[in-house]
């Protein structure tokens, strides 16, 4: 019974405790702050939030933070017992690439429940602040010096050289934004009017992280009075043999010029590069509007060039800087290619051109190839433009000689560079499918006719041997045992062959019949002997037959 009462008493105390705390706080429960926002600009970390109950006064707010891998919460320095709805915790040394969590609560004698902010990574949430801008005026140009808004920024320590800047400039009198340019941290805006006020604003961007900053405050400056000597214009660089030729235009004669160069990558680095410009050998104090210097003056790379004019008393401002790429300005060599011939097409494989020492030339800019081909017996040319290095030339005739030549062009129209044509290479296409079919048919016919040809040849040889090389006759001693004479040559005119005749005599009347028959045969043979060429043979035969008749009569008697 005591246990039951004790349990009931405990339940009552637990239920009453919140009521007691609420009464101690003035009879109201504190609510957690809402809509907490984290704003990070460069290295400045700002927290903002809203009160849940404006009617409750003298309420303070405190923040805790927690890093990844931590179990406990740590008080956020600079954001403890804050009476306003904003606090700055920039003094906290955080790893800007490490994820953190924040939580906030309201406090007045008692405390509200914690309100947790979604975890975030400072670098991803940070924005690029407005850069600092310093201006210098010339008569037709403005020199701009840009530096980060926060010096030695921790947030952008690894990306200081990756910033790009964009500029918006306009005449102050018009108020219309005229030009938008991408610029370096040290830049010069050309083609302005003298004694004119221009206003501009600049913002930074970090393209590698897809971050766009906010614009700087507007800065205005007035250009100076026009200088007596204008700067040189229209600067161009060309290649002749193993030298660079630098040319420019100028209004006045009897002037002296000098040319300077600077590594282009230095423009991306913050700082003053005024004293890093260097003179080009053979281009100092020249009296003409051009200068020539050897290619070995510059190693492979990108440079900036500028020219200045002087008459001995006055000096012009520096000309507009031009970009000079040794790879692009170098002489563009013709391509090297190999041809694989088919029956109705060529496969052309294009390779890098070769320089002295048979080493390939490495080209860091994209090229397109112009291929011209024609029949060796004709002057009608056809042209193909290809970006690929594996090109097929279709619709060719079988067993025909075609010639091919090629040259390279830069794809960038601003460069407008082309090589000379390569030497022409001539190749003969292979036989077509029709020729192969006829060849196969011819072989089959020849194989089929071969036995007949062999047989006909054998027969012909036998005839030749039989006519011109007959077999020898047997001797007279052997020949008398054979009554049948050998076959005569059918192709030559010969006497009639002798035929052995046999008679069967049954009675005397038969003998008379035989005699009559013999007489008839004799008359017929005599008639035939008049038309025969060999009459001697028939007379021999008659004698033989008459003898035979007499012998038969004697045998019968």
UniProtKB/Swiss-Prot annotation:
This is Interferon alpha/beta receptor 1. The lineage of its organism: Eukaryota, Metazoa, Chordata, Craniata, Vertebrata. Changing residue 386 to L: No effect on activation of STAT1 upon IFNA2 or IFNG binding; requires 2 nucleotide substitutions. There is a cross-link at residues 501, 525-526 (Glycyl lysine isopeptide (Lys-Gly) (interchain with G-Cter in ubiquitin)). Changing residue 422 to R: Abolished STAT1 activation upon IFNA2 binding but no effect upon IFNG binding. Keywords: Cell membrane, Disease variant, Disulfide bond, Endosome, Glycoprotein, Isopeptide bond, Lipoprotein, Lysosome, Membrane, Palmitate, Phosphoprotein, Receptor, Repeat, Signal, Transmembrane, Transmembrane helix, Ubl conjugation. Residues 528-539 have a biased composition (Polar residues). Changing residue 306 to C: No effect on activation of STAT1 upon IFNA2 or IFNG binding.
